[in-house]
Design a protein with these regions (language model features):
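Generic hydrophobic, amphipathic alpha-helix propensity
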Residues: 1-2
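Metal-dependent de-N-acetylase/amidase catalytic core
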Residues: 7, 11-14, 18-166
Length: 166
């Protein structure tokens, strides 16, 4: 299903052949994910948001985040949300992408996930896309949280965190 969805989107799917459930966050799996990411030399990595009701989402987020921390190369790292309020919790975006022109393509790709009722997933995502679009001034948008290695103060932090003269 995932590879069929990738075909619809015109992207190359890369799977690590993990079981559907019960993957541990351990040194072996972190090394495997880190090696795979390093081998691809990506510009960005997009991973699940770790505060999620679904255990597989939390696991994949933890593995990707550990790989990001362990990486010897630098790449952009973003978290995405999955059905905010139902699965992803406490998600406060730092970045948005207007998906208005590709929403139909995303819908088609979700329909490939027959075992997960892709149409029902689409209906939940469509509400989320419209809400996120409203937040950023687009008809539909996806939201992301960007992690930054540069140790800079991010917009929105309280003023007390900016001052170093305490």
């Amino acid at each position: 299903e995932a590879l069929a969805a990738c075909d619809v989107l015109g992207v190359r799917g890369i799977l690590l052949d993990y079981p559907h459930e019960g993957v541990d966050v351990n040194r072996e799996n972190i090394a495997r994910v880190t090696e795979k990411i390093a081998g691809e030399n990506p510009d960005i990595v997009v991973a699940h948001w770790p505060v999620d009701t679904h255990p597989d989402h939390r696991t994949s987020a933890a593995l990707a985040l550990a790989a990001y921390i362990d990486a010897e190369t630098t790449f952009g790292f973003y978290h995405f949300e999955v059905m905010t309020g139902q699965q992803s919790m406490h998600f406060h975006p730092t970045h948005y992408v207007d998906i208005s022109e590709v929403a139909k393509l995303k819908h088609e790709s979700l329909l490939c996930h027959k075992s997960q009722d892709g149409e029902a997933v689409w209906q939940s995502h469509e509400l989320m896309h419209r809400f996120r679009g409203h937040e950023c001034g687009a008809p539909r948008a996806e939201a992301y949280i960007r992690l930054d290695r540069r140790h800079t103060v991010q917009p929105g932090l309280p003023d007390l965190l900016v001052s170093s003269s305490v």
